[in-house]
Swiss-Prot record:
The keyword NAD applies. FAD binds at residues 13-18. One of its GO terms (biological process) is tRNA wobble uridine modification. Keywords: Cytoplasm, FAD, Flavoprotein, NAD, tRNA processing. Its cofactor is FAD. The keyword Cytoplasm applies. The gene is mnmG. InterPro entries: FAD/NAD-bd_sf, GIDA_C_N, MnmG, MnmG-rel, MnmG-rel_CS, MnmG_C, MnmG_C_subdom, MnmG_C_subdom_sf. NAD-binding protein involved in the addition of a carboxymethylaminomethyl (cmnm) group at the wobble position (U34) of certain tRNAs, forming tRNA-cmnm(5)s(2)U34. Its main location: cytoplasm. NAD(+) binds at residues 272-286. This is tRNA uridine 5-carboxymethylaminomethyl modification enzyme MnmG. Gene3D superfamilies: FAD/NAD(P)-binding domain, GidA associated domain, C-terminal subdomain, tRNA uridine 5-carboxymethylaminomethyl modification enzyme MnmG/GidA.
Length: 630
């Protein structure tokens, strides 16, 4: 072993969590080191070549608002972008972009290599070194010792990674990478509770062998859509995806080979993701369905490789090929890579604080799939928070903890540290109680100021945010002050043209816009309101139309805030509190909630338990007051 250097923060892993963590820590002025098994695997997309979607797109926008990199990077490397759920309510509308995988990696690698205060090195970490319950450094396979004050673990699916294809299983990481065997053992030695999950990926096929005429084209949306609030980004191509379906023949091939499927033969032990099941799992679970959607997605502009979305599998290679050839358009498909399942270790996230720091190992933060989540976006969001808080720990500042009513990032982390995981966790809009407040469109308004205050968002971007806030507020004030009457034929013409009943009497433009079919652009076209940039006009319109619903959600948030404000001591011995059941005590001791609000969200803890805790806190408060008076 030799002393290889001294850093403030060391980030282990260079996936989507690691990239955000390393950049955040370095931007906040910490001397930061990123260590990865392979420099070629930085920001790798081993599964789907896309970023975004419902809840996931919200996360990307929030990362961007706080000063993270994912939104900017996908804008620079996307080859298609679409707005999903555009016909639904604003809470669930979301962007989704297809990425040029290699370009995404190149752009991210360059960003990391050029970042001040950040060193990027290729090395396999085999041990986390601690002293007196605090991290002190890491040891690599080649004997290098790097000292540090904080570590961010972002190991993805590498911990004791095991690749499974049919009857074949071997140690490995994603896309032919090496697994991290000794590091997993080191974490167990540190006393971390660990579990085993699995995920999978579909085969890739050559575009030259696909019969596109048998598929339905899925083009991207026109217009200036982007994830980042701060940069418009370069002009990017718009490459179509393609839709086809499995059929009875496909399903029969799978059913005839279930005895060879590791998912059913017992070869796979880890629990897989509920919301991204393999094709063999879908065929068994949804036996009555005649077919399942299959999307062909481009992997990039510089390759003929296509991703077969919806056909994730760990069936033997020969069965995978037969399955592919049964799908319309893929009869002659050349399989470039087989699908596979990968098993990996994760840690129980209830061992973490809301800052993503381990409760019993000071300075050790974890982010991404090691915490039991799935998805690039979930990983990146955790990485950003872990990187920020590692830097804040080094600088002796309070951690950044986002509330559930502030951000989807807050929902994600609170779910992990409070409820834990029994399967790979995927963020959904339905997991957020206040999703109308947490829209994709207002992420900058919600979080941009926080990003600026902690030091990630620069002055130029903050000034842009302030200008946007002012334009929105001015627009709302103008709409409230300006009144129109039903005796104005021009007004009536606009109203009728929009399909709304004629106006009777006088009303404000704000009340007029509350009508479902009347849009800001209709009033602007008639010269009744000033022309505004589309994103500002859309924000004003949304705030007007949903004002009542938003007000109700804010009242609910205020009610819950009272429970969040009642802090529970970290050293509270729940077994000493009379009235709590044994089950509740076990749950409370495992999670050690920071507040009554968090305690209420722990599975197995009832409202009656909260009442007991409330009485206990009041009793302790009175005893404390008496002691002071005496």
């Amino acid at each position: 072993m030799y002393n290889a250097g001294n850093y403030d923060v060391i980030v282990i892993g260079a996936g989507h969590a690691g990239c955000e963590a390393a950049l955040a820590a370095a931007k906040l002025g910490c001397r930061t080191l990123m260590l990865t098994i392979s420099l070629e695997s930085i920001a790798m997309m081993p599964c789907n070549p896309s970023i975004g979607g419902p809840a996931k797109g919200h996360l990307v926008r929030e990362i961007d608002a706080l000063g993270g990199i994912m939104g900017l990077n996908i804008d620079r490397s996307r080859i298609q972008i679409r707005r999903l759920n555009s016909g639904k309510g604003p809470a669930v509308r979301a962007l989704r972009a297809q990425a040029d995988k290699k370009l995404y990696q190149r752009e991210m690698t360059l960003t990391l290599e050029r970042q001040e205060h950040l060193d990027v090195k290729q090395a396999e970490v085999i041990r986390i070194l601690t002293e007196s319950g605090r991290v002190k450094g890491v040891l690599t396979r080649t004997g290098a010792y790097f000292a540090c004050r904080a570590i961010v673990l972002t190991t993805g699916t590498y911990l004791r990674g095991r690749i499974i294809i049919g009857e074949v299983a071997y140690a490995g990481g994603p896309n032919g990478q090496f697994p991290a065997i000794e590091l997993a053992a080191s974490l167990k030695e540190l006393g971390l509770r660990m579990g085993r999950f699995k995920t999978g990926t579909p085969p890739r096929v050559s575009g030259r062998s696909i019969n596109w005429d048998k598929m339905t084209e899925q083009p991207g949306d026109p217009g200036p859509l982007r994830f980042s609030f701060w940069e418009e980004g370069p002009e990017r191509p718009n490459v179509s995806c393609w839709l086809t379906h499995t059929n009875t023949t496909t399903h029969n091939i799978i059913k005839d080979n279930l005895h060879r499927a590791p998912l059913f033969s017992g070869l796979i032990e880890g629990k897989g993701p509920r919301y991204c099941p393999s094709i063999e799992d879908k065929v068994v679970r949804f036996a009555d369905k005649p077919g399942h959607q299959i999307f062909l997605e481009p992997e990039g502009m510089g390759t003929e490789e296509w991703y077969v979305q919806g056909l994730s599998t760990s069936l033997p290679e020969d069965v995978q090929l037969a399955v592919l050839h049964s799908v319309p358009g893929l009869e002659q498909a050349e399989m470039m890579r087989p699908g596979y399942a990968i098993e990996y270790d994760y840690i129980d996230p209830t061992q973490l604080k809301a800052s993503l720091e381990c409760k019993h190992i000071a300075g050790l933060f974890t982010a991404g799939q090691i915490n039991g989540t799935s998805g690039y976006e979930e990983a990146a969001a955790q990485g950003l928070v872990a990187g920020i808080n590692a830097a804040r720990l080094v600088r002796e500042q309070e951690p950044l903890i986002l509330r559930r009513d502030q951000a989807y990032i807050g929902v994600l982390i609170d779910d992990l540290v409070t409820r834990g995981v029994t399967e790979p966790y995927r963020l959904l809009t339905s997991r957020a109680e206040h999703r109308l407040l947490l829209r994709e469109d207002n992420a900058d308004l919600r979080l941009g100021r926080i990003g600026y205050e902690i030091g990630l968002l620069d002055e130029q971007r903050f000034r842009k945010l302030e200008a946007k806030e002012k334009a929105i507020n001015d627009g709302l004030v103008y709409l409230g002050k300006q009144h129109v009457g039903g005796n104005n034929p021009k007004i009536q013409e606009i109203i009728v043209a929009c399909g709304e009943p004629p106006l009777k009497g006088t009303t404000s433009l704000k009340d007029l816009m509350r009508r479902p079919r009347i849009k800001y652009q209709d009033l602007a076209a008639a010269g009744l309101v000033p022309e505004l940039p589309p994103e500002i006009a859309a924000e004003i319109e949304m705030m007007v139309k949903y004002e009542g619903y938003i007000a109700k959600e804010k009242i609910q948030v205020e009610r819950l805030a009272k429970l969040e404000a009642r802090v529970l001591p970290a050293d509270l011995n729940y077994s000493e509190i009379r009235g709590l059941s044994r089950e509740s005590i076990d749950h409370l001791e495992r999670v050690k909630p920071r507040s009554l609000g968090q305690a209420l969200r722990i599975p197995g803890v009832t409202p009656a338990d909260i009442s007991v805790l409330l009485v206990y806190l009041e009793q302790k408060k009175r005893e404390g007051a008496k002691a002071c008076a005496g």
